[in-house]
Curated annotation (Swiss-Prot):
It comes from Staphylococcus carnosus (strain TM300). The gene is pepA. The active site is at K273, R347. Keywords: Aminopeptidase, Cytoplasm, Hydrolase, Manganese, Metal-binding, Protease. This is Probable cytosol aminopeptidase. GO terms for cellular component: cytoplasm.
Amino acid sequence: MPIQITFDEQDELASDVLVVALPDHLNQLSTLTFQGHNLTELLDTYKQHHIISSEVGKVSSTRFNENGLDVRLITVGLGNLKELNRARTMEVFEKLLQTLKGNHITSADVLLQSFASKAIEKIEIAELFSLQAKKALYHFNNYKADKRVPYHLNLKIHGAEADEVTAIKDGEIIGEGIKLARDFSNIPPNILTPEYFADMISAHFEETSVEVEVKDAETLQAEGFGLIHAVGKGSEFGPRLITLTYQGADDDSAPIALVGKGITYDSGGYSIKSKLGMQEMKFDMCGSANVLGMIEAAHRLALPINIVGVIASAENMINGEAMKPDDVFTALNGETVEVLNTDAEGRLVLGDAVFHASQYQPSVILDFATLTGAAVAALGEDKAAVFKNNSDAPLEEITKIAGENGEWTFELPVTETEKHLIKKSEVADLVNHTNGMGKALFAAAFVMHFSGNIPQLHFDIAGPATTNRNNFNGPKGPTGYLIQSIVDWLRQEIK
């Protein structure tokens, strides 16, 4: 583990490094004291002499040695507290943590109270700090020959009361859910086949409160999952449908359904991708990995809620058995689908998965998929597109929470036009592709067609599921996008 957090109700140092936050105006904070020293006066003096800075995210370091307290004082700027929010706070934590790592500091004491203000309470700061530590210090080197010991940081938190200690532990759990999603997403596709993916999921949740059921290729074909089977039959590694159930509430409480696209590798099939387009297609299962992260956090937090998770996993490859343009397959709901583009496979597996989830009579279905380049073209690489099928879907609640967390989601419409287009086949009930514009809207209409009247939100995370640069949420690669926000929403639903 890259980080270990301990607590201390006393002012006993575990290291020679003391971390304190510094706002523009110290009178915005209550007086800070440590071991009898008035740190507010000290910080103000150092700030006036430009020894330390309150600029947002600016990390400063100086030595303090007075009356028996001899520490390396590290401050991180908070800027104007009136402009401070959750997303900016997480950026501040990332700058601090990366500075500690860059300076090879392996142990530090943190004065929690210094980060709290009227803008963000201490209990919220506590959870965000531990969560961001897990995210920002994420490390994955499982397939490198040089097994260097990863950076490890011991943090001792001062001033955390009982509810704040709980918040810190909750933040760690959510962070570990994000780590789980990132770890799965980083596994190379020659290893993470649908079968291996299903086996790993079953093993991970063994002896937990999450039950796992796996359907193999033969079972999928026999039970009528025609779309998942069609996508996966071009690979020697057959498709899998993984259903996870978490029962945290009474049996009569309707579950929330979380559905994930789990294409462990996408060549495009006979509608083959270019050589550049094929790179990083191992990440076409990030939607399913993120669903796993959400369920991991929910069950470890023991949320009093019922969840059904559905992961449709397949490889979209080419052989003599693979689906072809013009093929027609029968979906689980009994409708036929004409395949015009084999690279529009994600919506096919999601169609069967969403209908399967609907059989559990959930209160809402949320699906997550790296589905269309059109969503990236519309919104950029750092934002997710979200679509709703009716007014009962919790769009406003989730987008508000996500925005506060810096996980930007923006609604795109599904209109009668798209609902008509998906039925524009001469030979089948539905068609999986359009040659016109609005491809993200078309794909969303197709996926949400299978939920019937059950409220559904479809998240197209093709852009932010991965990042090609280091940012405040951690290193480049898979991000675990929306895990934090969906878990926050689940907790809000309980309240």
